[in-house]
A protein has these predicted regions:
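Membrane-embedded transport cores of multi-pass solute transporters
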Residues: 49, 130-131, 138
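Transmembrane helix-loop junctions in multipass membrane proteins, especially transporters and channels
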Residues: 42-50, 121-122, 148-155, 200
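Transmembrane helix-bundle signature of multi-pass membrane transporters/permeases
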Residues: 2, 31, 129, 133, ...
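A generic, lipid-embedded transmembrane alpha helix
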Residues: 1-11
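N-terminal amphipathic, basic-rich helices that act as targeting or association modules
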Residues: 4-5, 116-117, 215
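Helix-loop-helix module between adjacent transmembrane segments
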Residues: 21-118, 183-191
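Loop-to-helix junctions at membrane interfaces in multi-pass transport proteins
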Residues: 10-25, 58, 101-102, 134-219
Length: 219
C-alpha cells in the first residue's frame, strides 16, 4: 500500500526535478522506517495484542492522549490518501486513453478499495498488495527496458543522469539544504512508526517471527 500509485507516479518526477536526494523521504525514509519497526517495535507491540495503535496510547497514557493522537493520525493521513486517490484517478485516465476522467477514475478507485477492504479485511489487503507488487515490479522493469532502448541504451540514460548530477544523494553543504534533507528523511523514517497502517500489518501477522521479520525484509 505504501508503494502504490502515488509512489510510482510521483517519485520519478521528484527524481528528475531534484535528483536522488529529492526522494530521500520515499522510498529511503519509508524503507528505513519498516526496518526500525521490525527491529525495535514489532515484537513488543505484537505481544500486547492490541487492535489499533491508539489502544497503545490509551493503555500507556490514558484516554485523553488516545483521543488526541487519534485525531492527529487521522489528519496526517489526509495528504497521503489524497495523493493515492489522485494518482489512481490519473492511472485510470491514462489507461483508458482519456475515456475515463480523473474524477471518475478516483471514484472508481475509492469504491473498489473500500469494497474489498470492508468485505475482505486485512486478508484482502494482503492479497491485493501481493498481486499489485508483482505487477509493479514486472511493469516497471519492462518500462525501464523499453525506455532505455528508446533513449539509445541504458548507458545513455545513466550518462545523462550523471551529467545533470541526478545521482547526487547528499545535499549541498548549507544549513537550509541540510535541514530540509534531514527533515524529509525523518518525516517518513520516524513519523510513520506510530501510524495505524504499519501497526495493523504488524498485528495481522500469524506469528511474532513474521511480525518482526516482515517489516525488515520489506524495508
Amino acid at each position: 500500500t505504501w508503494f502504490g500509485s502515488e509512489t510510482v507516479l510521483g517519485i520519478p518526477a521528484k527524481f528528475i526535478e531534484g535528483g536522488l536526494g529529492n526522494v530521500v523521504e520515499d522510498p529511503f525514509g519509508a524503507g528505513f522506517c519498516l526496518i526500525l519497526v521490525g527491529l525495535f517495535f514489532a515484537g513488543k507491540l505484537y505481544r500486547m495484542t492490541l487492535l489499533t495503535i491508539s489502544d497503545y496510547y490509551r493503555e500507556r497514557y490514558g484516554r485523553v492522549v488516545e483521543v488526541v493522537c487519534s485525531l492527529i493520525i487521522m489528519l496526517s493521513y489526509l495528504g497521503w490518501v489524497s495523493a493515492q486517490v489522485t494518482a489512481l484517478g490519473l492511472v485510470f485516465n491514462l489507461l483508458s486513453g482519456g475515456a475515463i476522467s480523473i474524477p471518475i477514475g478516483m471514484t472508481i478507485g475509492v469504491v473498489s478499495i473500500l469494497a474489498y477492504t470492508l468485505f475482505g479485511g486485512m486478508w484482502s489487503v494482503a492479497v491485493t498488495d501481493f498481486i499489485q507488487m508483482i505487477i509493479l515490479v514486472v511493469g516497471l522493469t519492462l518500462i525501464a527496458v523499453f525506455a532505455g532502448n528508446m533513449a539509445g541504451g541504458a548507458d545513455k540514460v545513466i550518462e545523462l543522469a550523471s551529467s545533470r548530477e541526478l545521482f547526487r544523494f547528499l545535499p549541498e553543504p548549507s544549513f537550509h539544504d541540510i535541514a530540509f534533507f534531514i527533515a524529509a528523511a525523518i518525516t517518513m523514517m520516524f513519523g510513520s512508526i506510530p501510524q495505524q497502517d504499519v501497526f495493523q500489518r504488524v498485528m495481522s501477522a500469524n506469528s511474532i517471527q513474521a511480525a518482526t521479520r516482515g517489516p525488515v525484509i520489506g524495508g
